[in-house]
Amino acid sequence: MASCPDSDNSWVLAGSETLPVETLGPESRVDPESEEAPQALQDSSKADGKESAGTLNGEEMLFQTESSQGEGAALPEESEAKGALGGDDGHGTKRPGDTAVQEDLQETPMVTSLGPDTQDLERNIHPQNLPSSPRAVWKEHGCSSSDDDTDVDVEGLRRRRGREPSPPQPTAAVDGEDQAKGEGIGELGISLNMCFLGALVLLGLGILLFSGALLEPETEPVEEAELQVFPETELVQTVGNRQDEVEQLQASVPPDSVPSLQSMGLLLDKLAKENQDIRLLQAQLQAQKEELQSLLHQPKGLEEENARLREALQQGKTSHQALESELQQLRARLQGLEANCVRGVDGVCLNWGGSPQGGKATTEQGHKGQEPDTSLLEQHKQLEAEAKALRQELQKQWQLLGSVHRNLQRGLQDAGQGAPAHAGLAELGHMLAQTLQGLESQGINTGRSSNDSEAWHQKKPRFQHPREWSGREKWRGGQRDQKAEHWKLKKEESGQDRKKSWRDEGREFTGHWKENRPRAEESGSRKDSKRQDPKVHPRKSGNSHSGERQKHSWGKDNSPDSVSWEELLRRKYRPPQGCSGVADCARQEGLALFGVELAPVRQQELASVLREYLARLPWAGQLTKELPLSPAYFGEDGIFRHDRLRFRDFVDALEDSLEEVALKQTGDDDEVDDFEDFIFSHFFGDKALKRRSKKKEKQPWNHRAVGPREEHSRHPHHYHQG
């Protein structure tokens, strides 16, 4: 047996049929079809290798390329065998190469069965140690098999002359080209993976830088943070685009880069959370900004309040200075009275403000031991009592001024601490008004009527000493001697001086207070109206009292009727409390006064009632022509303004004006005593008047003596009744 496949002999299995065996030499001709078939198969294998290289990556493409090369090397043998079989079928005769074809067909399975082995060898052995082609592998296996067959029983086998082998194909070069292409494709796949990973790394760095830029504005000012925060819509679009890019990268990147995609997802989640925190911080900053703006607007109101408090403080200081100056004047006058007193041996003041000659005569009489007249002693006692009462009253005034001073200081302290000082200053003004009224009631006539208290809530004078009034009545009796008359004249002169000085002080003081309170302004206007006539002098006897009063009341105007209505229009009253609206205040006033609800009073109805009443008075013709129904008391709709003043006060003021006119025309004001009942009976009915009359009977004092009409009266003679 031959030990090498290059020998010219081969073995053929003898079949059941005895075939003629011919020993032939090597064929000089090779079938062209068998040569073209391997080349076509090689070309197809190369094309298949290129297509597989486009879809697979790296090492798998290289492995498949090598396996396809092995299969391509085996396919020429199969094609050659098929060509031989085709030739047999076509011609129906056997050619000399039939035995060779059969041998090739028998040997082809061996080659195909060696395919897996070659694949295993390629995996375990370096490519440089592999054979150049599968044909070489087949030759090696052929040699080994022929060597093994030498030991096997060759019975039934016949040896024949084989054909000359065809020249070897240049498979090595093709294999080198395929390997180079596979390596290039693998390198391309590796480079794509590296590009994907690099893009992911760059994207991650960009996101980190972007998130760092968003976190920086937390320590910057509010304005910069607001400028760097992106709008919500743009942020959502950016996040959505990045998520789409990440999904595309996940679909295109191999599974080896999955951990990097997970880290990118975590980064995106972190970025979304940070964006939410940024939006929350932005909302908080906006709220704080609005709060700061509101706080910036508040100082404006505080500045206005501080300005008002400063004005009130300044007014309090001026009033305090006025009180101090008045106190100093009182002290000076008291010292002057004590200095003008001429005392006797027993220390009793014998003469107040007497002339030096009279004082010397009295002193000489005292030294001579002559006893004074009994009437003179009585007068001295009375004067001493009056002086004592005056000292007591001055002491009370001193205490009152001290309390006012303390209250003023406390009010100024409260105003300095930011508390509203209007209430304290109003109370202080009220006390000062009472002080002035007390001074008027003491006999120190300042030329002012008791109606000045109307601006300070219509309070009655506090300081009225009965002993002083009795002393003044005794002076008016005219049963005094020459010295008493002389003392009286001196006292009246000193009273005039005090009146002038106090009038000036009161005018200055009222001028300060009327800037803050409209009622004080009203009071000051009345006081100025009283001072219009410079010819007015203080009364010196009871007979001249009426003329002085009328002159002081009407002034230079010769039409007292119109002046009365004008005085009525100047008056202002305290508005009703505890109600809102015209109808509500009218109803509340009716229930409080008569227990009957009062409908809002109309201007036409009240005018008709007034004309009806004035028609009964023969002297009230001028008053009927000009009724005091101005817009100050009635609105545009003709309804009485119950929410600004009470209807009862308005009726009382009308009655006071009518009493003044009646006193001027007839000398008696009893003719208009039924005016109030006439008006109320029209609006409330007779039942309400009866109920009111029952209430009057239960009262132990005279209603007219203390009613609001007496408080509003401008004549001081009301205080001297009884």
Swiss-Prot record:
Which cellular compartments is it found in?
Cytoplasm, Cytoskeleton; Nucleus
Identify the domain of life.
Eukaryota
Q: Does the keyword Transport apply?
A: no
Region: Disordered; residue ranges are 1-180, 442-562, 691-722
| InterPro entries (alphabetical) | CCPG1/PBIP1
Keywords of the record, alphabetical order, are: Coiled coil, Cytoplasm, Cytoskeleton, Microtubule, Nucleus, Phosphoprotein
Q: Which residues carry this modification: Phosphothreonine?
A: T150
What spans are recorded as compositionally biased (Basic and acidic residues)?
88-97, 465-536, 546-559
Q: What does this protein do?
A: Regulator of pre-B-cell leukemia transcription factors (BPXs) function. Inhibits the binding of PBX1-HOX complex to DNA and blocks the transcriptional activity of E2A-PBX1. Tethers estrogen receptor-alpha (ESR1) to microtubules and allows them to influence estrogen receptors-alpha signaling.
Q: What is known of its domains?
A: The C-terminal domain (AA 443-731) contains a nuclear export signal.
The name this protein goes by in its record:
Pre-B-cell leukemia transcription factor-interacting protein 1
